[in-house]
Amino acid sequence: MSLFLDTARIEVKAGKGGDGAVAFRREKYVPDGGPAGGDGGKGGSVIFKVDEGMSTLMDFRYNRIFRGKPGEKGMNKGMHGRGAEDLIVHVPQGTTVKDNETGDVLVDLIEKDQEFAVAKGGRGGRGNIRFATPRNPAPEVAENGEPGEDKILLLELRVLADVGLVGFPSVGKSTLLSVVSNARPKIGAYHFTTITPNIGMVQVGYGDSFVMADMPGLIEGAHSGAGLGIQFLRHIERTRVLLHVLDMSELEGRDPYEDYKTINDELESYNLRLMERPQIIVANKMDMPEAAERLAEFKEKLAADLGPDKEMPEIFEVSGLTKTGLQGLLARTSELLAQTPEFLLYDEDELADETAYYGFEEEEKPFKVSRDDDGGWRLSGDKIERLFIMTNFDHDESVMKFARQMRAMGVDETLRSMGAKDGDYVRIQKFEFEFVD
């Protein structure tokens, strides 16, 4: 878990499907009742649901494992087991769910009451009523329930704010937020006072409002993890308008123009799309005696750097301490929000390319063969292991069915071509049997 409670690593395991039953009708006046074993019920899935009342991932610090319930077993008289209820896990709005191993984004949960099954429950095993044929009207075959999906997930929470305040530490972002909104951030005259994003609702005129977030201070190298690092930049991705706060006083001994360039370089290095957002320069602490002169120097350097062909960005002179210049800043910010659509976190073209690429990948082989240290053979792979788990070895016909499935998959032929001989041990998970050529 990160310092800012915006990431969490958890395990989700869906419920196993219920086992199918091997049973026969044994009723008076029904001498040839036939099979009557019902199917097992579906295992419970683990479903994430957006909860607008949550604002952090704090709950996942203490509860990291979420398990769905198994489905009921099949019963006699063809009765199927009851499916298990899904496990609903509430997450904050704005949570991004990633596969911890691959880093792939599974879902971006941004809509109210949005749901997504992060781990699907296993299907119930079929009872012997499903395997009756004219050649075998009374089969002693049933399947075990399919195991539920088991995943390690990485959760990331980005602040859902319309406007983000960015700038170096101690330039007055927290003070500014406190006087224009209902937020009450911690304020202090030292670096990194803000270590988590503070959010406030800003009212503009009658009925207009927007959410503003005081993003923790950035430093040079933040995109590669320097200082409090990349954690800060993650929070900026969802904002639509950036207010770049600069300290025009001499209290910190900083150069506003160098600060301005450094912060924008960090934003661009982390994600090029951050620079597509409208950005207003907020010249703060203009109540200080030397502020006007430093602002003039800043404008001169910026104009020289941009050249005659580029338009100067908007600059608003304010003082968070004396509350001057804020109404004009907020009104202009509200106008920009009305003109600016939401930004996608992930490029749709890139996702489309990935989808096309994966669509043409060769189908994964149903099994792999390797050698153990003692010379035995080991079979592995999702498909063959799933068949193994779903085979009920208490019944000879089920074992024979599993042997036929392996033969159809080409297991016997592959082992033979690799040099397996009569009497060699072949293992699947913890099960061991002898190879017969």
From Swiss-Prot:
Gene3D superfamilies: GTP-binding protein OBG, C-terminal domain (3.30.300.350), GTP1/OBG domain (2.70.210.12), P-loop containing nucleotide triphosphate hydrolases (3.40.50.300). GO terms for molecular function: GTP binding; GTPase activity; magnesium ion binding. Mg(2+) binds at residues 174, 194. Its EC number is 3.6.5.-. GTP binds at residues 167-174, 192-196, 214-217, 284-287, 319-321. Residues 2-160 form the Obg domain. It is an enzyme of class 3 (hydrolase). Its cofactor is Mg(2+). Residues 359-437 form the OCT domain. GO terms for biological process: ribosome biogenesis. Keywords: Cytoplasm, GTP-binding, Hydrolase, Magnesium, Metal-binding, Nucleotide-binding. CDD domains: Obg. InterPro entries: G_OBG, GTP-bd, GTP-bd_Obg/CgtA, GTP-bd_prot_GTP1/OBG_C_sf, GTP1-OBG_CS, GTP1_OBG_dom, GTP1_OBG_dom_sf, OBG_GTPase. Residues 161-338 form the OBG-type G domain. GO terms for cellular component: cytoplasm. It is found in: Cytoplasm. Belongs to the TRAFAC class OBG-HflX-like GTPase superfamily. OBG GTPase family. An essential GTPase which binds GTP, GDP and possibly (p)ppGpp with moderate affinity, with high nucleotide exchange rates and a fairly low GTP hydrolysis rate. Plays a role in control of the cell cycle, stress response, ribosome biogenesis and in those bacteria that undergo differentiation, in morphogenesis control. Monomer. This is GTPase Obg. The gene is obg.
